[in-house]
Amino acid sequence: MNLQDKRIAVLLSGGVDSSVVLYELVRQGLKPDCFYIKIGPEEDEEWDCSSEEDLEMATAVSHKYGCKLEVVDCHREYWDQVTRYTMVKVKAGFTPNPDVMCNRLIKFGVFHEKCGHDYDLIATGHYATTEEEEIAETVNRQSFNRPLKWLCTSPDPVKDQTDFLAQIEDWQLQKAIFPIGHMMKEEVREIAEREHLVNAKRKDSQGICFLGKINYNDYIRRYLGEQPGDVIELETGKKIGQHKGLWFHTIGQRKGMGFGGGPWFVVKKDVHLNILYVSHGYDPQTAYKQDFPIHDFHALTLPLEQCFGSPLTSGYPITFKIRHTPEYIPGTLEPTADGYLVHSSKPIHGVAPGQFCVIYDSNHHRCLGSGEITL
């Protein structure tokens, strides 16, 4: 893609990845405008948030390359949309992914409404790539070629972030560019150190994008409080303790249980009776699933039927992820009356309702979309 005649907005987070994005664009003779999206809490004295340091880093990098930086306050929209989604899901016993929805609703959504609509392209530091092609279509007997843009994986399987982008809309993907998506993380670090970027040695952020050092359970507790209930051993029906709220636990969880006689892992939640079921390992298969349904499938570029052609009797050949890991699991995808059924090539630990199952082609190259797991 020729970028020379494009108006480009760069989303700077204060981290090394988006900073190298700016360097890469400036190196090509471009002068994009930079934006820092404010989504963190306002109560700085109550929340141990790193947003102030993030903004300082973003400011320093933008000034280094002579680009203007504008702070875009998306705080209210984040808490109205992403936080509400998260709390509704966890209260219902599901396992949501706030970062997936942040990309769709905030970084490529609200930002576009406020500023991004003035730009041809929006550049971010995501580890992802894109491909463009044209397909022939006929409308009202007129034939034409329609351009398509595919979301594709990064060559760095550990850092690949296509799973976090699998819910964005096609029009959002059309405007997105990922200038470091073809690089390995080590290469990005080397560029940052060579260019003496202020955040070259800064650690990567972990967990939900704005929380910083805030504990996720404290974030949940702020909105939902605590609701104690029984913890029951699945195999024996024996009560082994109490939990402080089902929303503090996820299916497949092994750590941080706080019960004696372990190890334990969470296998089921009864939201109506407020019971947490755990297994001591008598029947470890209770924590594994090989087939599971997904609903509300969101296709990125084309409907799945067009990606694969006619449905096969054995289902569509795919690879998939249910969490942010380097592994792409082979399987098949079978259309059903109200969604799809995923058949995994092997049993998977910790399949939980509310998780996004991200679907890729059989070579785990193109990301085709994602759906929410239902059990």
At which residue positions do the language-model features occur?
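ATP-dependent adenylation/nucleotidyltransferase module used to activate substrates
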Residues: 1-166, 193, 266
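AMP-forming adenylation/ATP pyrophosphatase catalytic core
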Residues: 123-129, 135-140, 144-375
